[in-house]
Amino acid sequence: MTCKKMKLLKVYVSSTDRINHVLLYEIIAKKAKDFGIAGATAARAMLGYGPSSILRDTRFFELVEKYPVIMEMVDTPEKIDQFLEKELLPFLENQPKGCMVYTFDVDVYLAKMGDTKIKKCQCEE
């Protein structure tokens, strides 16, 4: 089976975090796109807590709009490392909002656009 060695960057933020009236996860997605990161997704978490130990649950989101948002971005290890060092970490470190950022290596077995063309990946050992 063939694959491509990539890196996944995950960022956890709050759904209510804003910088100058813009949602933080939207800012992160735009920064990733502008930097040329291959792909990014923001997803609402069903349940979670962070350093505050306050458990956030979406079952009661009608009453509380605050829930965890998970940003996932994938690209080559070099591109993710450059994005972290030059763009994302300096930006987040200067913000008053809480977050968690981490990466891990992933094997991408299929990267397919919405047509019939399939990009085959070859593992790099």
What would you call each of these model-derived segments?
Residues M1-E125:
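Positively charged, small/polar-rich N-terminal and surface patches that mediate targeting and assembly
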